[in-house]
Amino acid sequence: MDELTQANTLAIDEDLVDSVNSVKGWGILKSLNPSYPDISLVENVITFGRLKDSTVHYNDKSISGSHCKITRESNDDDGVVIAFIYDNSTNGTFIDNIKVGKGSRCLLASGQEISLTPQKQLEKIAYIFQTVEKEIEDGGPSNKYFIGEMLGQGNFATVKLAVERTTGVKYAVKIVDKKKYFMNSSARKDSLMDEVNILRGLSHPNIIQIIEVFENEKVLSLILELVECGELLNDIVSNLFYTEDKAKTLFRQIVDGVLYLHNKGIAHRDLKPENILLKHKNFNQNDAIKLTDFGLSRTVSDGSFMKTMCGTPQYLAPEILTSSGGHNGYGLEVDCWSMGAILYIMLCGYPPFDDSREVSIFEQIRNAKFEFDPEDWSSVSEEAKDLIKRLLCVDPHKRYTCNNIIQHPWFNPNVKLSTLLEEDERLRKKAEAEVEANNNNTNKSNSPKMLGKRKSEDGNCSDSNNNNNSGSKSLSSIKSNTTMLDCDEKSNNNNNNGHKKSKSDPTSNNSLFNNDNNNNNNNNNNNNNNNNNNNNNNNNNNNNNNNNNNNNNNNNNNNNNNNNNNNSNDTTDSDTDDETISLPVITKNSKSMSNLQNHLNNNKINSDDESETSTNNNNNNNNNNNNNNNNNNNNNNNNKPSTINNNFPVPFPKSPTKNSPNASPPIKPQNSSNNNSGLAGIDKPKCQYDPNCYRKNPQHLRDFYHTVSSNK
């Protein structure tokens, strides 16, 4: 035994030890007044009073004739002693200084004090009631320890004074009733031994020490280090609140004890002033504080979390309140929240969260709604209040740990609060910048893809390997166009000098057929002319020599009958560049079908034109490059069809020329009364690819006649 423990000794009457060991009855009353002897309880009914026929006779006039009686009501087979005391007195019978009341009875427990006289009486007649149960035969604590008065009581456990019979050293014995304990449905089978297993592996001056364990079928008895100065809560209440210096001294000992637990991976989970005991009043000693009541403690391994709703509401961390809702549980941080609430009480005398407010206590905790009333906190330093704020932090990841507490300005004079606050502000701004950057990246990646040209291409639609493109299109020119034909990303012609391939049609012919009355015929020195408007019915064609290398003729569509549409459904578009230029969307022209039929009926193909353009009256169109966009008709069988305005125009087949003698002759559209589209009275042109039409989409089948369409 250490010196401090040895100091807690009691002069034990050897007769008491002998009487308990030699008693033949079921209990004993140990007299607290040397003038009166001990009483062995042998009979099942023992009477006390001034009457001569009383089992225990008294001559004191303060004792009634029939003062009280003690009865034993138990089964000898199970060895459990159940005893009651009945009060028949005028002046009263007292159990632990509480009056039973005339005509009432009280259940007796080992270690209780029975007094037959009021406290104000000079001569006290009192006894300590002690049962001799079967646990002595089973190796219980009563064989080694004298069980004395009650020190505390809980739902399923009582704490009593225990005196070692051979040495007289005083301890505390915590007696747990197993039956009551397991009536709690949430208790695990092995949970009863949690406190035992945890305490056995601990040794710290600020943690209660376990001395010995006794267990039988009915009770679990823990012999613990005795702490005689009571609970921290009672001391705070008696002082109203602590001075900041006293609070700092005691709180540091609490932190040291909790830090020791956390380093071993143990969470107390029920830290509160009631579970913190004072060993002595010399607070400057490092063992003045003792953490106790580890019944709710759990060992937390790395990466694991606890999910049980436990603890006292005023000291519960927010994550405990939400742990039963499917969240990730909680860890050691819950003890730090509880320490914040304890420090708050130490400095002002009342808890930070209270049921008496309009907002529920759980809502207060979830949102950390507490305040520092100037009336009570004006004399408290900003460092102390700042530490409380950091402990009562809703986010457990940002909450201060025990190591952080020790390095806080309230404990560490080398750290200034202003420096700490500046660092907080820097981290806050950094976090905001990171969040803003992440939001920008998210918005950019989630923004809809707009049709347009890559900025990196600087106006060139073709992803060609030729660096001799002379026709670059300015950004303002792109923005001014009301129609846009996307160009293929990859061109197989490395010497196209700006030659562009339209994405919207495998034949590179735009399917926008416009009735333009003032279309200009241009003499282009660059093959970057997409001939988007080559399929126009022109009435007044002027011959202009235009040397602009990137003339797409797209602006001519602004003067047409609003047949333009920039909504291409080409499924072969592989452009993944995020940086696109948004162009205005053109509404669908309701006359697109009639324009299509007019074009099919009026269009003539000039087989002698080596450039194979399909314009109607553009005989003066002098292109100096034979690799015209219409050469892309060879891709008809290799590319998927596109859709514009939900119409599916048939690309014109090649006419036999010198360069392509095997080209098929043009097929004139045929009208058929067989209307597969379901629109009665409207004749449809025959598909030029029938019966080998590769366009299998429903819209095309409805717009063009097929002799074998039923098989498509």
From Swiss-Prot:
One GO term in the molecular function aspect is: protein serine/threonine kinase activity
* Annotated ranges, domain FHA: 46-100
Its family remark reads: Belongs to the protein kinase superfamily. CAMK Ser/Thr protein kinase family. CHK2 subfamily.
What is this protein's record name? Probable serine/threonine-protein kinase fhkE
Composition-biased stretches, type Low complexity, lie in 436-446, 459-481, 514-571, 595-605, 616-639
What EC number(s) does this enzyme carry?
2.7.11.1
Catalytic center at which residues? D270 (proton acceptor)
Enumerate the residues binding ATP.
L151, G152, Q153, G154, N155, F156, A157, T158, V159, K174
Which regions are flagged for Polar residues bias?
669-678
Using the record's annotation, list all stretches that form the Protein kinase domain.
Answer: 145-411
> Its GO CC terms?
nucleus
Keyword Kinase included in the entry's annotation: yes
Name its species.
Dictyostelium discoideum
Q: Which reaction does it catalyse?
A: L-seryl-[protein] + ATP = O-phospho-L-seryl-[protein] + ADP + H(+); L-threonyl-[protein] + ATP = O-phospho-L-threonyl-[protein] + ADP + H(+)
The signal peptide here is none
A Gene Ontology annotation in the biological process aspect, one of them, is: DNA damage checkpoint signaling
* PROSITE patterns found in the cross-reference section: FHA_DOMAIN, PROTEIN_KINASE_ATP, PROTEIN_KINASE_DOM, PROTEIN_KINASE_ST
Q: Sorted alphabetically, which keywords does the UniProt record give? A: ATP-binding, Coiled coil, Kinase, Nucleotide-binding, Serine/threonine-protein kinase, Transferase
Gene label: fhkE
Write down the top EC class of this protein: transferase
Identify the InterPro entries for this entry.
APLF_PBZ, FHA_dom, Kinase-like_dom_sf, Prot_kinase_dom, Protein_kinase_ATP_BS, Ser/Thr_kinase_AS, SMAD_FHA_dom_sf
Q: Which residues form a coiled coil?
A: 414-442
Q: Where is this region: Disordered?
A: 431-695
